[in-house]
Amino acid sequence: MHKDGVLIKGNREGINATIDMEKFSSFEDMLNMLIKKLSKGKHFYKGTTLILNINLSLIKKNDIKKLKESLLNEIELNEIIFEQLELEEESNKQTKIFNGVYEGKTKFIRRTVRSGQCLNYPGNIVIIGDVNSGAEVHAGGNIIVLGSLKGSVNAGNTGNKKSIIAAFLLEPEILKIADVITISPDGLEKPKYPEIAKVKDGTIIVEPYLANKYI
C-alpha cells in the first residue's frame, strides 16, 4: 500500500484502486485524495471501469453511495465495482523472459516534447529528447524515450498489448499500454538507469532495461 493510503493500478477492464481507510482521519479526506489522484488521468480513465478495493465495514452505506456518485460525476467512469479489501500475498513467481518487441514503422522526434504538446503516430515513436510533465505521446506501437519521460504516454493505442514503453528515466504521470493503465506513485525515488514497461498478466510491470535481454 502506498504511504498516502491510495494505490492505483491498471487492469484489463480499466483501473484498480486500493484504499487503506486507516490512513485517513475521515471519509471526506479519503474521497478527496482518491479524486485528486484519479483526476491526474481523467483523460485516460473516462469511460473505463474502476474496481475499488476497500474495507467496506469501515464506511457507512450513505458514504458508499456518495463515493460512487462523486467518482462517476468527477472522473466520468463507466462503472464502479466495490470489492472487499483482502491482504495480498507476495508473488514469488519469476518474471518470464521478454523475447522481443513489436516492430513496424517508426517516427523519430529529435526534440523535447513540452507541456501542452501532443504527439500521435500509428507506428512506433522514438524521442531523442525528453517528454516533459503535461505533454502527451500516443503511439500504435512502442514508445522509446532517449531522455526523461515525465508526461503521459499511451503505447499500443490500437489494442496491441505487446507494445512497450522505455526511457532513460521513466517517471510518467500516466502510462498506458493498449487498454491497461497505471500512474506513477508520488514521492518514490526513481532509479537512475533505463527502465522498460510492458503488460504481463493484465497489468503493467516495470523492469530495468537489460540490453542483452531485449535483443
From Swiss-Prot:
Domain of life: Bacteria
Pfam families: MinC_C (PF03775), MinC_N_1 (PF22642)
Keyword tags: Cell cycle, Cell division, Septation
One GO-annotated biological process of the protein: cell morphogenesis
Subunit and partners: Interacts with MinD and FtsZ.
Family according to the record: Belongs to the MinC family.
Function: Cell division inhibitor that blocks the formation of polar Z ring septums. Rapidly oscillates between the poles of the cell to destabilize FtsZ filaments that have formed before they mature into polar Z rings. Prevents FtsZ polymerization.
Protein name: Probable septum site-determining protein MinC
Gene: minC
